């Protein structure tokens, strides 16, 4: 009996050893980083609220480059990087002897018939002979609060890094880069590997998700305002430090560098993984569906294209039932100790002081001063007239006797003549 029993136990032990060891779900201590300084000096301009441009303005005359982005494991980092040929654009500006340029970087998440604004940043009076983003003036970065908790811009502020993204992050992203009014679009198709990361800032399970989704009509009517639907966040240097700090505290390893995203080719769906997002052909087919975009979203038919019409889709509207994901708390909950809170850095600067108007003089005092001035002028005029009339009738004034030099000790005067 012992022989078969030992054989069975040995087989079970061998199977147990061959199984992968589950990753420990614990946090580790990491020295909190110091608040970083900006790479260069600039002036932060607080802009009043304004509309976010539509991401659906592309067409045949405006081609869109498409890239594919994924990560090796669920708890890894994901990079959305594509060279938009900014260096060539800036070199052309130098050849034109342009002293400066203006730029805007915007990120969207494209859904069925709508787009979610994720990130907005403006640059003014930029130096074309330096790297992109070296400018005299910049606005604060404006973020979707959910995405800001686990994502940050790359060092050149043109790419996007996500740390342990949740399953709901999959889909199509669009970057719009404006330089002196000319826009260049780049799409990123994000697909995640099988499995879920235990420390992801995920949506459905914990009730956090992206903000509202707006159809093309709302963008065209300038209803999507950046200060209404986006939140001001830390500068890029501090944003990177806080997300990396949170990622490393949960056992993550930040890569020393990130490779550029590959050209988009629909990958096969891995076992347990989500299928890749549709390509341009399916999107164009979707655009040709019924004009009633809202009905297309709610019915069993295929999703409409980005030009579909309808009301703005909030997370509650997308879910359609109570208990669906809702926007999460402030994304600075994981900031290192000693760092300024978002409330401390996101308040608008005080309005410029205007010189105060002088205190108004009471009416009675003003009347008294005016009366006194009139009396003084009248008295002076009366005195001058009195002297003039007296002298007019009296003739010329008598001459004073002319003194003559003394002769000896005798003084005398010249006779009047």
Swiss-Prot record:
Localization, UniProt: Virion membrane
Intravirion side: 390-417
Transmembrane stretches, start-end: 361-389
Keywords in alphabetical order: Disulfide bond, Glycoprotein, Host-virus interaction, Membrane, Signal, Transmembrane, Transmembrane helix, Viral attachment to host cell, Viral attachment to host entry receptor, Viral envelope protein, Virion, Virus entry into host cell
Top-level taxon: Viruses
Start and end residues of each stretch annotated as Disordered: 259-356
Residue numbers on the Virion surface membrane side: 19-360
Keyword Transmembrane helix applies: yes
Family designation: Belongs to the herpesviridae glycoprotein D family.
Acidic residues bias spans: 279-292
GO biological process: entry receptor-mediated virion attachment to host cell; symbiont entry into host cell
Keyword Glycoprotein among UniProt keywords: yes
Membrane topology term: Single-pass type I membrane protein
Signal peptide (from-to): 1-18
Positions of glycan attachment: 41, 102
Principal location listed in the UniProt entry: virion
Full protein name: Envelope glycoprotein D
Disulfide bonds: 75-197, 114-213, 126-135
InterPro entries cross-referenced by the UniProt entry: Herpes_glycop_dom, Ig-like_dom_sf
